[in-house]
């Protein structure tokens, strides 16, 4: 487990992180999501013990001061990884030697390169011969070759195309199944991340939030207006709010009209965290994101009815 308690991190007068409590099951694949500046990368550095917080503590497998041997069970991939200024082969030798498994070079290097879609001819390439996308692939492969107990991946799909992103996703799932590896992954690629993750932690302005802010709308005079026929009156305590987040998990969906419902066109359906459906409803010029059980059947383009629960709304501004 990773256990975060009373964590605060400030840069001067600016508060970057403020997390009273967070528990992450590191045997699973956990998504760390949030907009730019939400604190994802900073939290990843703190959880990997690369950066000290201003106050509070992080415990990794019960230890707030993990030994070097314990930290060897963790692999960290940063957004802009740098290779040693040597051949790819020498990079693999260096990382495998650091973990005492250099004798398994052939097996581990071959498997890792294959997982990221590269053949063994890349072992002979020098670092300067690689494109940014190839550098990202090799860096990820170096981490995979370690078969670590836990991976902390910060924007792993940076600089790679859609096809390579899919390979990375398959690699994560393979390592989880084959070696029991756990992952905490921060990424702006929500679609890619939701396809591989089992759990989600959402950050907003350095704080862990109850739900992911997929629905953010402007409000005026206590009203959300999606089109001329779709108007939602907000609870009295939010009448002065100008920006509202709507919890996707607190929207009821129906294929037939229900009391007090609104209607729209079903825009798209995709799997979310492997256990729910992310259903997008088009209403006027807006897309409303909702979550539904994976057992429900929907057809894109059909009329869909929905109703906001009373506790669905959160005032942001």
Residue positions per predicted region:
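Conserved ABC transporter NBD signature motif
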Residues: 56-70
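Conserved ABC ATPase "signature" region
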Residues: 104-122
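Conserved ABC ATPase signature
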Residues: 126-130
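Helix-to-loop junction immediately C-terminal to a conserved catalytic motif
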Residues: 48
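Catalytic Walker B motif of ABC-type/P-loop ATPase nucleotide-binding domains
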Residues: 151-155
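Conserved catalytic motifs of ABC-family nucleotide-binding domains
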Residues: 80-90
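Non-catalytic connector elements of ABC transporters
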Residues: 225-317
